[in-house]
Amino acid sequence: MIQVTSEQWLYWLHLYFWPLLRVLALISTAPILSERAIPKRVKLGLGIMITLVIAPSLPANDTPLFSIAALWLAMQQILIGIALGFTMQFAFAAVRTAGEFIGLQMGLSFATFVDPGSHLNMPVLARIMDMLAMLLFLTFNGHLWLISLLVDTFHTLPIGSNPVNSNAFMALARAGGLIFLNGLMLALPVITLLLTLNLALGLLNRMAPQLSIFVIGFPLTLTVGIMLMAALMPLIAPFCEHLFSEIFNLLADIVSEMPINNNP
């Protein structure tokens, strides 16, 4: 019969507990993995499996579990995981923003519904673009790249009481501008053409006031918008590939800035 001593239990707890906090924090905020449609047991099981794979290669931390240092260490691991997952959400937020811009120009701003995944009121076109971005993210193996980047953080920023550089979180805050910038770049061709169409309808209304511009304008704008979206579809995949690559490079820069360099 195999007997396990209390020292062995304590060693395993120190070895697996701290990495598990960082992994679960990432899963709770990362794209796709944080969807409410995924059961919590599946998320917990995935986090435990990832931890069982990566933890044996990490040195055990001997911080007492019931201490102020352990509380600070737990907050640090959770903060690192949340920062990684939250940054990756910027790419999907940019695609959703593009869908909101296009839907607004198409006259679909009122076509909203409660998203079952996030329980937020979201435009239909934004949700379609978001689902397309999720499929492309899986196609490009983005989830594997994200887990690989998480593993790298354990070597770049080992589990310990060392503080995290605040410059990394400043870079994370500045990266929020990528949402509006990339969303506008993706939607700009459709917005420009639909704006031109609306200007033409406005001139037509001035030249022929007897025409009911509301009866003509909405079906025409909606039809042209659907045609433009069909033309835009082949360009979404390379755009998302470039966007995901940009976000992963940003994540790598943020992770590299997290350790505090004590060298003069």
Curated annotation (Swiss-Prot):
Matching Pfam families: Bac_export_1 (PF01311)
The lineage's top-level taxon is: Bacteria
Membrane keyword on record: yes
Q: Where in the cell is it found?
A: Cell inner membrane; Bacterial flagellum basal body
What are its GO biological-process terms?
A: bacterial-type flagellum assembly; protein targeting
Reported function: Role in flagellar biosynthesis.
Q: What is this protein called?
A: Flagellar biosynthetic protein FliR
Q: What gene makes this protein?
A: fliR
